[in-house]
Structures are given as C-alpha cells and as structure tokens.
Amino acid sequence: MAVKIKLKRLGKIRSPHYRIVVADSRTRRDGRAIEEIGLYHPVQNPSRIEVNSERAQYWLSVGAQPTEPVLAILKLTGDWQAHKGLPAPAPLLQPEPKADKRALFEALSSDGDEAKGEAITPKAKKSDKKADEAAEASASTESTEA
C-alpha cells in the first residue's frame, strides 16, 4: 500500500484550513485518513503551521511520500531536513501576542478621568449671508405690494 502525506482541506469558501494527514495514495483529497499529524492555516499572518514532528519522522521513515505542498511545509518546520540528515532551517515566525484588552481598557479609562478644558475654537454661528438674503427677500416683496 502506497502511503502519502497530504493536505486535507477544511473551512469555508475562500477561507481554507488544512490538516496534514497520512492516507493511502488512492483515497480522495478529503477522504478517510490513516492519521492526522498536523495542521496548516495559510490565511493567518504569519501562517499557522503545527506538525507533530515525532509522527512525521515515523511516517517518513517507513516510506510515506509527502506531496509537494506538504514537502514545502516539512522543510519549513525542519522535519524534512531531520529525515535527510541536513542542517536545520531558521525557526518559524510566531505571531505577536495579542494585547490584553482589559489592561488596555483600564489604561484608556484612567486617561479619560482627567478634566479636560472646553473647546478652544468657539462654535460657528449662522452666517450673516442667510440673514441678509432673508431681509432682502422680505423687502422686495413689500416694495412690489406698494
């Protein structure tokens, strides 16, 4: 039985998520898998890649052939180099930790407690043009009546 390590697509339209699976080469893309050894989320920045290195090494050692996309992922994680005995690549980029929303809220709310002065510029008053036009219109109606 020929075994392949391939990607199994999950997710919605235009929002792909993949699982890295070991499956018989004759099964369809999203068909039954022998084992799931990782996941790949390409939409996130940087892409989320998680591979169970121990299981990937096992399946590579017993002859499982990775597909081209999985081979690229295994090279990024360093599992392919470990299998072939090559030097390891640079570590993967990790996403920045998200800021604590509660601490951010408290910091902003403490800044808002300070009394702030009134507006520097006064409110704009209605323009004198509109008042002049209204006066001219009423004057012209009075002159035509006389």
UniProtKB/Swiss-Prot annotation:
Identify the GO cellular component terms for this protein: cytoplasm; small ribosomal subunit
- List GO BP terms, alphabetically: translation
Q: Which Pfam families match?
A: Ribosomal_S16
Q: Report the coiled-coil segments.
A: none
Is the Hydrolase keyword given for this protein? no
Q: Which InterPro entries match?
A: Ribosomal_bS16, Ribosomal_bS16_CS, Ribosomal_bS16_dom_sf
Which stretches does the entry tag as region Disordered? 84-146
Bias class Low complexity marks the residues at: 136-146
PROSITE patterns recorded: RIBOSOMAL_S16
UniProt keyword annotations, A-Z: Ribonucleoprotein, Ribosomal protein
Q: Kindly give the SUPFAM superfamilies that the UniProt entry links to this protein.
A: Ribosomal protein S16
Give one GO molecular function term: structural constituent of ribosome
Listed NCBIfam families: PRK14520.1, S16
Q: Which family does it belong to?
A: Belongs to the bacterial ribosomal protein bS16 family.
What is the name of the protein in this document? Small ribosomal subunit protein bS16
Q: What species does this protein belong to?
A: Streptomyces griseus subsp. griseus (strain JCM 4626 / CBS 651.72 / NBRC 13350 / KCC S-0626 / ISP 5235)
Gene encoding this polypeptide?
rpsP
